[in-house]
Amino acid sequence: MEISSHQSYLLQQLNEQRRQDVFCDCSILVEGKVFKAHRNVLFASSGYFKMLLSQNSRETSQPTTATFQTFSPDTFTVILDFVYSGKLSLTGQNVIEVMSAASFLQMTDVISVCKTFIKSSLDISEKEKDRYFSLSDKDTGSNGVERPPFYSSSWQEEGGSPHSHVSPDPGKPWNKYGYPPASQRSPQRPLAKHEQRKEPSKKAKHVRLPQPSEVVHFKPGKGEAQTDSGNHVSQSEEQVPVDAEVDPAPAGFQYSQGPDGIARSFPDDLTRLRFKCPFCTHVVKRKADLKRHLRCHTGERPYPCQACGKRFSRLDHLSSHFRTIHQACKLICRKCKRHVTDLTGQVVQEGTRRYRLCNECLADVGMESLPADLEAEQHRTAPADGDKDCRWHLSEEENRSYVEIVEDGSADLVIQQVDDSEEEEEKEIKPNIR
């Protein structure tokens, strides 16, 4: 029968012993502040202490002292309290320091908890940002009255009104939108090009949200239909300069009626930059870039080098390190591409080409019986000082079989390879050249 409360009770007793400095056989010095602890507890909770105490396992009778300068005493207090109580006190101010210290002490549980804390804080910031953008979409006035969408005075059709502003004409469809025909409009003075360039502010002041009091939707009553018809024409003429000076909408602009029209008309440049670092002002567009940026704060190096064990925070830094440090000036066999040394391989020169082969590849090509006094044999078999050709040193039978005739059909050139002097070679080759 297992009692689950026994482990927590035992941990509480060890924590009380640590606070009262009872049976503490290890001292940790962090920037001048001394912490007392038990070696068995530190050995079981940290990979770094496990490696450190294993080296000093023979000196168990003497107390052990460890000194750290990589983190602050407050950070180590949080970690030591977690070791003895299982409770990790994380805040937005100390999570980076705690995660960096846990990475140094090789405490994987603390690192995973810190990562979860950072991710949850990012999710909270994302929710707040989404809430901010959702509130900004509801473009309301200062008095609580919702503002109408853009271009509502000239693009919105009045449906169901018993009396229209101007009598409808089937040949002139603009009348039903409350826009007067060309004959009723007063001539407007067009803006000159230099005025448009010099005074952009005058032109831009017309492009704005109409206030609730400025909406030009005039619906006369039954008794006022005839008396107010002239007033409506004058109001339409006053509205013409505003609508005439508004720049035409771009091709990608979408007109819509309703509160969602404003949100869809604006570009979504603000919503693209949605990943902000919770510890600095850095903002990125992708979550992977934010994850890589957080390693600058946490000190995490997840990519180890397989050759020397050095760790890196980015994969491209690891590949550059391996290429420049471990593969620079590396001798490899040309055939099997394995690493060779002066003892496990030899340099082979074939004409002007020089390459290196390992002993196994030399045995495969039948060159395992190279003479030990290679230089002396080269002096005995060298034809002349001016002959720079370096041939393979083979036996007499192989030399006889190596003599062959190479025919070139394109130039009708026949070359016979024999071991003769230069003068005899020239006499034999010159008559064959056509």
UniProtKB/Swiss-Prot annotation:
Places the protein is found = Nucleus
Annotated SUPFAM superfamilies: beta-beta-alpha zinc fingers, POZ domain
Q: What does the entry list under GO cellular component?
A: nucleus
Primary localisation category: nucleus
Q: Which Pfam families match?
A: BTB (PF00651)
Q: Where is composition skewed (Basic and acidic residues) in this entry?
A: 192-202
> Mind telling me where the Glycyl lysine isopeptide (Lys-Gly) (interchain with G-Cter in SUMO2) cross-link is?
K172, K176, K193, K430
A molecular function (GO) held by this record is: zinc ion binding
The record's region (Disordered) falls at 134-238
Specify residue ranges for compositional bias: Polar residues: 226-238
Residues bearing PTM Phosphoserine? S161, S167
Which Gene3D superfamilies does the entry link to?
Classic Zinc Finger, Potassium Channel Kv1.1, Chain A
Ranges annotated as C2H2-type zinc finger: 275-297, 303-326
Q: Which residues form the BTB domain?
A: 24-92
Instruction: Tell me where the transmembrane regions lie.
Output: none
In terms of PROSITE patterns, this protein maps to: BTB (PS50097), ZINC_FINGER_C2H2_1 (PS00028), ZINC_FINGER_C2H2_2 (PS50157)
**Keyword set includes Secreted:** no
- InterPro entries in alphabetical order: BTB/POZ_dom, SKP1/BTB/POZ_sf, Znf_C2H2_sf, Znf_C2H2_type, ZnFinger_BTB_dom_contain
Provide the alphabetized UniProt keywords: DNA-binding, Isopeptide bond, Metal-binding, Nucleus, Phosphoprotein, Repeat, Transcription, Transcription regulation, Ubl conjugation, Zinc, Zinc-finger
Per the entry, what this protein does is: May be involved in transcriptional regulation.
This one is known as Zinc finger and BTB domain-containing protein 8A
Q: Report which gene this protein is encoded by.
A: Zbtb8a
